[in-house]
């Protein structure tokens, strides 16, 4: 009977190859949280026992000195917004510049994704323009990776809920169906589903009309469900994924008077002026 092959990530393998003292130290750290290491980091090729109890480098130091893609991505995810944590305007501008550059230009997809995610959690309005540009620059990667980056940018823009990003989100939803492979069609549908969810953060009639249009014209179940969820978020009403039911709520004046959130349906003319 053949024995099971050794797994380098198993404790007994580590004990044989690193020595029992090192293995014990690793186990102690992982079980008690005394070291800033994860199991993936311990079992990675770059792991060194001598660094076991070494404090992690600050994110800015990593970004200024390291070319390791994984380390840089982790550092980008760890950056905090200076102004929200007692920092100065100068520090804020520096961090925004670092994140924006990574979101738009980094050669590593994971670094772009982490930078975009972090910008989505910032309150700084400058992040919005960077996120929009990150969406458009995602095309430098292969289609599947580009779709992931675009979707992350749309999620981040939805968190900001800034009217400057409304044009991009609606543009994605109004793009014609893709003529191409099944993969290309699915990539574009993933974008549209993400955009429909992001639109739930914009309590504007332009948003509700776009979402209503999805219920009227689209057949994809996931996209229709995303549109319904966003309409529910905007209006506070719970209705089925049905165009007629939502059309009545949004356009019938009597039904609108009974709606719990009367402020969501703004005058379309006013909205048109705001969206320019």
Language-model features and meaning:
Residues 75, 115, 150-153, 195, ...:
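Conserved hydrophobic register position within alpha-solenoid helical repeats
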Residues 67-68, 107-108, 138-139, 145-146, ...:
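Short inter-helical turns and helix N-cap capping residues of alpha-solenoid HEAT/ARM repeat scaffolds
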């Amino acid at each position: 009977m053949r024995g099971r092959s050794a797994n380098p990530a198993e404790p007994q393998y580590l004990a044989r190859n690193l020595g029992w003292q090192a293995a014990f130290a690793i186990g102690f750290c992982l079980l008690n949280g005394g070291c800033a290491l994860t199991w993936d980091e311990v079992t990675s090729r770059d792991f060194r026992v001598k660094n076991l109890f070494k404090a992690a480098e600050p994110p800015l130091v990593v970004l200024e000195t390291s070319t390791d893609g994984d380390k840089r991505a982790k550092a980008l995810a760890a950056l905090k917004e200076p102004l929200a944590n007692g920092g100065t305007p100068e520090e804020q501008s520096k961090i925004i510049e670092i994140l924006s550059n990574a979101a738009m230009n980094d050669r590593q997809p994971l670094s772009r994704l982490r930078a975009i995610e972090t910008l989505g959690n910032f309150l700084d309005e400058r992040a919005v323009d960077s996120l929009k540009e990150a969406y458009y620059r995602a095309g430098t990667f292969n289609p599947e990776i580009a779709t992931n980056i675009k979707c992350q940018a749309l999620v981040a823009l939805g968190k900001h809920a800034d009217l400057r990003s409304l044009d991009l989100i609606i543009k994605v939803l109004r793009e014609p169906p893709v003529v191409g492979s099944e993969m290309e069609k699915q990539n574009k549908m993933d974008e549209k589903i993400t955009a429909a969810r992001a639109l739930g953060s914009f309590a504007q009639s332009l948003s509700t009309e776009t979402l209503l249009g999805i219920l009227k014209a689209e057949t994809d179940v996931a996209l229709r469900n995303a549109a319904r969820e966003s309409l529910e978020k905007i209006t506070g009403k719970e209705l089925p994924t049905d165009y007629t039911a939502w059309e009545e709520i949004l356009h019938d004046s009597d039904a609108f008077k009974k709606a719990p959130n009367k402020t969501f349906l703004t005058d379309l003319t006013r909205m048109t002026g705001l969206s320019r």
